[in-house]
């Protein structure tokens, strides 16, 4: 079978993505545009972008492969990945947007008033982002190898190049448009061939192929040793890990206000529910006509190989090309979101902002190059880890670190910096140990080995318990301005209250500060000090030094005057 159609589809997706990104470049002029799209993305567009970013290589290829190989137990994966947004909707979306932070480290310092917590959060963002980039590049290599027989590194390098070219010029503005486009492309790419495949397979007679996998084993849930623990651990990792993924959380900062964040999350639940029905169907079809892929160790490629197993000639080539385009879009959209979130943290916390917005943009672009290159190197090191399992471990790390910090930080005023650090270190240490054990193939037996395969059932409760216990033991370290911060997080934007200020010292020109004011006022956030140009540093939260330089700033909706640590809208 000729692969020219598939190669043409990959090229077309890459070129179209670059064209959409170039259009976004026309709208990107400030650091606010680069990092949070000036907090002006509408709910439907943002929901499409969130869904496009979230549906990664594991969703497009891995779910079908796992359903084919392991059976009905793997149905918990799409359920958990979708249900995680229900937690975001109820507990996190609106307060996180009202915080006015750029990134998770920004939120950590705002809530806990600790530079140490910020630094640890920054390291975790980088670690989680790089871990999640690995399966994206692995999937790209798998796709190109399946279609053309080319070495895996060719596909990995191609995705890295396109991602870099998309992110470097336009930042979050470009990425938002690209990811929204990719969601609908992925949906069409899976849905259209599925109609043809279901019609053809439904017309066949006889028994399904069994290959090396018995039908009875495939349909029996909770089979095997420690199956119940592994299932619970998988559910916990996917359910709680969603809110801890930095590239997911950063998208909520791009909404206009807390209400828009909630609306976007509701639309995301609908879009994800519609999408995740499709890879499960491919896994079931693969069990029917291509179960030999399991014995051959190619279960992850079942989506790409199904058309050629059912059809011949141009129809098979066309359907395979469409699926290849969707798979490539999955790698690109998730990778761009990850690169933006990790590069944003690197440019803020490690490279610095310099003397103005141009220096900040330059730092962001340099960080983008670093992130792409490092993730490529890590992909080579971890070549033997299955795509879907690499994603499961990433979710376990996120669920064991940022999820407890976010939930307790938003809803419990008793959380202290000591408790947050202790919890993230305990949960992160255990889950990262599982990652290293899996990556380097360190053989372990007994219950310890089971925990290393799926650590979330142990690491997540332990992280929560450690944060609560350490915070109760250090009540005297409770943040000084916690009451004001809680008002900031929970009071609706249309309620005009003194929400405090989040204005650390900055070295920027008056023009840049004026531009930030316009972006903040246009976002409709309603709170002062939440504009995207305000990055926390070592300056104490709410101190006079941190805010006196921000007095007398005019926005576009009216004048906003600041004096000391109080703010009033006139």
Identify the function of each model-found stretch.
Residues 491-570:
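Long, low-complexity, intrinsically disordered cytosolic termini of multi-pass membrane proteins
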């Amino acid at each position: 079978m000729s692969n020219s159609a598939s190669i043409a589809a990959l090229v077309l997706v890459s070129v179209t993505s670059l064209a959409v990104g170039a259009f976004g470049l026309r709208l990107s002029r400030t650091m606010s545009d680069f990092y949070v799209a000036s907090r002006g993305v509408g709910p439907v567009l943002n929901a499409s972008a969130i869904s496009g970013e979230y549906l990664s290589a594991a969703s497009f290829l891995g779910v079908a492969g796992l359903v084919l190989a392991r059976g009905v137990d793997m149905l918990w994966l799409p359920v958990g990945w979708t249900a995680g947004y229900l937690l975001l909707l109820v507990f996190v979306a609106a307060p996180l947007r009202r915080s006015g932070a750029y990134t998770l480290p920004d939120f950590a310092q705002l809530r806990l008033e600790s530079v140490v917590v910020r630094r640890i959060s920054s390291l975790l963002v980088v670690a989680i982002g790089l871990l999640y980039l690995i399966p994206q590049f692995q999937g790209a290599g798998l796709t190109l190898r399946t279609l053309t027989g080319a070495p895996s590194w060719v596909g990995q390098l191609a995705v890295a190049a396109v991602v870099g070219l998309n992110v470097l010029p336009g930042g979050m503005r470009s990425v938002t448009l690209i990811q929204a486009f990719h969601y609908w492309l992925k949906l069409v790419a899976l849905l259209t061939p599925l109609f043809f495949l279901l019609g053809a397979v439904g017309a066949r007679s006889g028994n399904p192929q069994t290959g090396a996998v018995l039908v009875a084993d495939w349909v029996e849930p909770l089979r095997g040793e420690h199956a119940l623990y592994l299932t619970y651990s998988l559910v916990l990792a996917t359910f709680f890990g969603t809110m801890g993924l930095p590239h997911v959380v950063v998208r909520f900062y791009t909404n206009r206000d807390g209400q828009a964040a909630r609306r976007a999350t509701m639309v995301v639940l609908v879009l994800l529910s519609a999408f995740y029905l499709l890879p499960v169907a491919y896994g079931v079809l693969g069990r029917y006509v291509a179960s030999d892929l399991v014995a051959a160790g190619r279960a992850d490629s079942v989506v790409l190989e199904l058309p050629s197993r059912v059809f011949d000639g141009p129809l098979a080539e066309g359907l395979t090309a469409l699926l290849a385009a969707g798979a490539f879009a999955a790698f690109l959209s998730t990778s761009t979101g990850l690169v933006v979130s990790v590069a944003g943290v690197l440019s803020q916390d490690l490279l610095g902002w310099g003397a103005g917005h141009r220096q900040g943009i330059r730092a962001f672009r340099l960080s983008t190059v670093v992130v792409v290159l490092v993730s490529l190197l890590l992909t080579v090191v971890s070549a033997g880890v299955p795509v879907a399992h690499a994603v499961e471990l990433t979710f376990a790390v996120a669920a064991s670190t940022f999820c407890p910090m976010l939930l307790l930080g938003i809803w419990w005023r008793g959380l202290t910096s000591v408790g947050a650090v202790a919890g993230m270190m305990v949960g992160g240490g255990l889950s990262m140990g599982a990652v290293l054990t899996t990556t380097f193939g360190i053989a372990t037996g007994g219950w310890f080995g089971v925990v290393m395969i799926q650590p979330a059932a142990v690491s997540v409760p332990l992280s929560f318990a450690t944060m609560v216990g350490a915070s109760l033991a250090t009540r005297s370290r409770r943040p000084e301005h916690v009451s004001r911060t809680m008002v900031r997080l929970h009071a609706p934007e249309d309620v005009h209250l003194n929400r405090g200020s989040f204005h650390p010292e900055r070295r920027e020109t008056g023009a840049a500060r004026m531009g930030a004011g316009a972006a903040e006022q246009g976002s409709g956030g309603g709170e002062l000090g939440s504009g995207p140009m305000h990055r926390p540093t070592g300056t104490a939260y709410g101190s006079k030094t941190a805010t006196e330089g921000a007095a007398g700033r005019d926005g576009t909706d009216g004048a906003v005057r600041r004096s000391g640590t109080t703010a009033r809208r006139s």
